[in-house]
């Protein structure tokens, strides 16, 4: 064959089926490549200003979680002690006292330019304005019954009125101030008084034996005379009234009312004459009124010497200390010291001495 024949000879041709299968393979490869590129996207390229741009062209924002700081548990403060609450407090209101009144806290009179004070709406307790803090925890014992009258002859110790609230509701006519004083004195000295009840004063025992031995001697000169025997019997208790511990030139009178709580207590009203049998104990004396014998506190009586007279105050009076006058309340017991001068007389209350008008005194 010549060169022309070789050049002009036809090229070998592939069948159509093989061509189509090759195209299908290319398409499949391209499809796989497109899915792979979607899965593996390149990270966003940073811009000149430092912001990252996503595939869509918008900026990408990053969210950072804040770290929670662990707070230290603070120690709880100690619990506060429970505050006392008064379930029945006083209901004080401003009050103008036309007549002089005593403060139930400090026992001073509300007079002169200080007539303005406080009065409880229910129990009618009178106090100064500056004394209100002392009765914040004091319970009010309610409205006073219509038949209740305060015994102003009793000593004024009103800083302790808690023990007498129940007694006042049960016995409407008892003085709360006096009940507090009486209960405190009796409970404080109860043990001493028990031992004292069994022991008798030897001098008093001798005085009791003397009348028994003197009875037959007194009956001899009056044989057959029954009146003489009665007189002798009447003289016998009079001999027992002699005070072995004191001189016979004086006697004792009750300043305040003392109400007996026990069987061996001596009950007496103010102004009663008392015969002292035993005064060996400083806190409890043994006395006699008529046929009654018992114990009582010595600060409830006053000694009256020969020539002195006992009076009862018929009207309250506010005295001027600058001129030696004394302030007394109604129904108070006093002892006269000296004679009258200018309508005034010198009196003694057991604690204070001063001048008092005779028009307001009644001799007992």
UniProtKB/Swiss-Prot annotation:
| Recorded GO MF terms | identical protein binding; zinc ion binding
Which stretch is the leader sequence?
none
An example GO biological process term is: positive regulation of protein localization to plasma membrane
Q: Which Pfam families match?
A: C1_1 (PF00130), SH3_1 (PF00018), SH3_2 (PF07653), STAC2_u1 (PF16664)
The Acidic residues compositionally biased stretches are 64-78
The UniProt annotation puts the region (Disordered) at 1-89, 189-244
Where is it localised?
A: Cytoplasm; Cell membrane, Sarcolemma; Cell membrane, Sarcolemma, T-tubule
UniProt keyword Metal-binding present: yes
Q: How does it sit in the membrane?
A: Peripheral membrane protein
Output a single Gene Ontology CC term carried by this record.
Answer: cytosol
The SH3 domain is annotated at 247-306, 307-364
Q: Which domain of life is it from?
A: Eukaryota
Positions with biased composition (Basic and acidic residues): 212-242
Predominant location of this chain? cytoplasm
Which UniProt keywords are listed? Cell membrane, Cytoplasm, Disease variant, Membrane, Metal-binding, Repeat, SH3 domain, Zinc, Zinc-finger
**Function of this protein?**
Required for normal excitation-contraction coupling in skeletal muscle and for normal muscle contraction in response to membrane depolarization. Required for normal Ca(2+) release from the sarcplasmic reticulum, which ultimately leads to muscle contraction. Probably functions via its effects on muscle calcium channels. Increases CACNA1S channel activity, in addition to its role in enhancing the expression of CACNA1S at the cell membrane. Has a redundant role in promoting the expression of the calcium channel CACNA1S at the cell membrane.
Which disease shows up in the entry for this protein? Answer: Congenital myopathy 13: An autosomal recessive disease characterized by congenital weakness and arthrogryposis, cleft palate, ptosis, short stature, kyphoscoliosis, talipes deformities, and susceptibility to malignant hyperthermia provoked by anesthesia.
The protein's assembly and partners: Interacts (via SH3 domains) with the calcium channels CACNA1S and CACNA1C. Component of a calcium channel complex with CACNA1S and CACNB1. Component of a calcium channel complex with CACNA1C and CACNB1.
> What protein am I looking at?
SH3 and cysteine-rich domain-containing protein 3
Question: What is the primary gene name for this protein?
Answer: STAC3
